[in-house]
């Protein structure tokens, strides 16, 4: 289970203006965002949360890895380390869209992709690695922690989300 503190850490990492913000300040901001912006924020936070969760998972398995400092690092998201040396860089994709993964492979055919479990299962070979982390769990953690006020089951935005297949 993904803890709410991990979601708040992802927000602080992904938004410079929240680097020193309290949980309450973060919640206040997201409770007042425009409904059109919710999906973009959810995707951004989910991607950063996925990076954190994957590095933690590797660490628990005795594999040293690090997230690049910049959240917009070109092409790759995580470096697999051997001491001070980077032995491999991988791109992470928190999605349930196989076409999104296919496009990433086409754009960067020499870069391995680590994907959420739902979509990784639809690929054969070594290019897409199953992270062992479910996209649905990431979406749920983000929506329940920081977007619950922005989107609730009876709000007009939730109805729009259901119509367009958004996870809220």
Regions found by a protein language model. Name each.
Residues 1-46:
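Interdomain/boundary linker segments immediately adjacent to catalytic/signaling cores
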Residues 6-10, 65, 113:
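Generic preference for hydrophobic/aromatic residues in regular secondary structure cores
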Residues 26-29, 36-106:
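Catalytic centers of nucleases
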Residues 4-8, 102, 126:
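Intrinsically disordered, low-complexity regions
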Residues 107-153:
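Extended, hydrophilic extramembrane loops/domains of integral membrane proteins
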Residues 3, 22, 97, 116-117, ...:
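Helix N-terminus capping/helix-initiation residues
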Residues 153-168:
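Short, glycine/alanine-rich hydrophobic alpha-helices that insert into or span membranes
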